[in-house]
Amino acid sequence: MCIRDSKQKERVEELRLRVMHPLTVLTLEGELNAAPDGRASLVTAEDLEQMLGAVTEYSRYACIETLRQGFLPLRGGFRLGVCGSAVVRDGEVSNLKDISSLALRIVCEHIGLGSNIAPQLFSADGRFLSTLILSPPGGGKTTLLRDLIRVLSLGDAEHRALRVAVIDERCELAVCCKGRAQMELGNHTDVLSLCPKAVGIPMVLRGMNPQVIAVDEITAEEDIRAMCLAANCGVGLLASIHAASVDELHQKPLWRELLRARVFRRCIVIRSNGGARSYEVGDLPCSD
């Protein structure tokens, strides 16, 4: 398969470049050949080095903190994933060399996506109810999370604006570049970039007096402990997790621990069908 029409081009989410393979594009329908005739020329190692040099302005050292984590945030909200040979020192990745793959992520900013969903995340007396967003990888969690942050931060006729602190560990929500957010997150949002969630949550609790803390992709026990700390301080939580359903949350120990913590009241399950996405909002049951 390949990209042939304008509608397919609009649904492109990533460009994938791999040494000695043709350029491909990732869409909701899957990974497709970029060339109309299916005969794209092969990507070379020199192509990848040239692209990496251009996006780092030929100063990799200035970008080493994110590069060693496997990505680079770029101007305009783009994000470049990087694979190659890891240089490991004292048990930590200090650099990447012999670059073999690049993935240019085209960040999807869907302003208004969360407008009809956000009102369902409040109690009858107007309190925000901590909410967990669920979908498989690539299911649109980050896009929805980003717009819900914007909606909560701006407020509306029914709900006042809330102070939202975003722990943007991998620069996927605000996509900050040189301290400036490339995405629209609202007027009352504070962003802490490139900081582990377990470290960043206590930091913003101490320093920024948030009413809501937003994080992307809960992956570790320390993340859950930090969110429990925030919940015990009376702060609302907005987060996402890789899971296709609430039932799947009960199947893995880490997620069962999350349910037992009872810090989330609402859940949003994102489902994809034939390239279209639907959003199901409901109460999040607790685990015994």
What are these regions (language model features)?
Residues K141:
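Conserved lysine of the Walker
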Residues M208-S272:
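Conserved P-loop NTPase nucleotide-binding/switch module
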